[in-house]
A protein has these predicted regions:
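N-terminal accessory targeting/assembly segments
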Residues: 1-109
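Extended, highly charged alpha-helical segments
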Residues: 104-131
Length: 131
């Protein structure tokens, strides 16, 4: 039985004043994504001075990311950052067909997919709801 390989596009904003090692971060999120069995089809880099409260990145770039994701036919748009609930909701309003995850969401998904017992799945689901 052939299972379709899920695919993703990674959005990797680079905040100018951040001390975070950008290239290591992109490499790390790609490894986390591969742990899910998801293949990365592309990385969208964006230099930003400040975090946009609506989409994290600018609205034009958000629309561009969605168009690129549709062109590539990916299953996920994954941010290499933590999105606020408002940013997640706004991004999902722009696109309802492609699943959206941020860095903590990827980690929670890894835990969920690897949970074996009913109790562990419940624990992960509670963590998701709290997040």
């Amino acid at each position: 039985m052939n299972r379709k390989i899920e695919t993703a596009i990674v959005v990797a904003p680079r905040i100018w004043k951040s001390s975070k090692n950008y290239h290591n971060s992109v490499e790390e999120i790609s490894l986390l994504i591969s742990t899910l069995g998801v293949k990365v089809k592309g990385v969208v880099e964006q230099k930003i001075n400040t975090i946009n409260p609506t989409y994290f990145i600018g609205s034009g770039k958000a629309k561009q990311v969605i168009e690129q994701a549709k062109m590539l036919g990916v299953d996920y748009i994954i941010f290499d950052e933590d999105l606020s609930p408002v940013q997640t909701k706004n991004f999902q309003k722009l696109n309802k067909d492609i699943k959206l995850l941020d860095r903590p969401g990827v980690i929670l998904e890894i835990f969920f997919r690897n949970a074996k017992s009913k109790e562990s799945k419940t624990q992960v689901e509670l963590a998701r709801l709290q997040y």
